[in-house]
Each structure stands twice: as structure tokens, then as C-alpha cells.
Amino acid sequence: MGILERKIIHERTTLCSHIPYPQFVLPRHKHVEYELMLFTRGSGKQFVGEGVLDYQQGDIAFIGSNVPHLHLCNAKLNPTMDFEPSAGEALQFHPMIFPFNLEEIPDYQFIYHLLQKSQYGIRFYDKELFEELKQRFLSINVY
């Protein structure tokens, strides 16, 4: 199966976008932006690169730049069972927001290593962090 190269087109010039997903319908895709995904409803399987991991409401995923990914909702995978459809909120940001020589700047070492690890996908299971991020996402204008 091919990977959809997704271009994020903005109505205005910005390096960061908040995108609500009332349901997960995109095929396996990738984009240059990093993506912080909050799973706000439902459960299913998340494919990031070559890895597969279950997700559920309250989970947070951080996906690296140009990493193929897909979210498959259990309601779609098992239509005969009574699963709630999945939904999420994504914050996508362009790599250009970081300094060009990020790895050489001591104050950015933690961020540099986090961005490197995001090439494999990072999962966070912190309910307090989820609630804080959800409130912050909702305060950002969409797109």
C-alpha cells in the first residue's frame, strides 16, 4: 500500500496548525510537520512507521516529520461490536520553527533528542498532561 504525501495548506502563513479530527478517515500518510495527537474519543490501533500500538481516549502521541502514520478506529475495525468512534485533536508544526543547528545548541539538546525519538513515535499516558494540552489546543485557532 502506498503512502499518501499530505500537504498542509493554510489559509494564512503559519508554522503551526491546530486540526480537529471528528473521526479518523485519512489513509496512511505523512507530512513534513511534526504532529502532537490527542486521542479524545474511542480506541483503536495507531501505526507509526513500522510500529503498531493500541490507543484509547486520553492517550497522547508525538509523531516525527515525514513519518508515515495511520489511526484505525476499533469502530471501523470491528463494525459488529459496540465501539465508540474515535476522534482527536492534532497540533502540527513545521520543522522550521527550530533553529537550523538545533543539535549544536546546548539549551536545545533535550528538544533535539525528543525530535529524534519522534521518528519512531512517542506515546504519553499522563492524564493531567492530556487535560492541560486539550485545554491549550482548544484555545488555538483552527488551522
Kindly give the residue locations of the regions a language model identified:
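Residues in well-ordered beta-strands of folded domains
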Residues: 18, 37, 72, 92, ...
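Basic, amphipathic alpha-helical hairpins
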Residues: 137-143
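Residue-level signal for functionally critical sites in structured catalytic/ligand-binding pockets
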Residues: 29-31, 35, 44-47, 69-71, ...
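Generic protein-terminus/edge-of-domain signal
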Residues: 1-61, 67
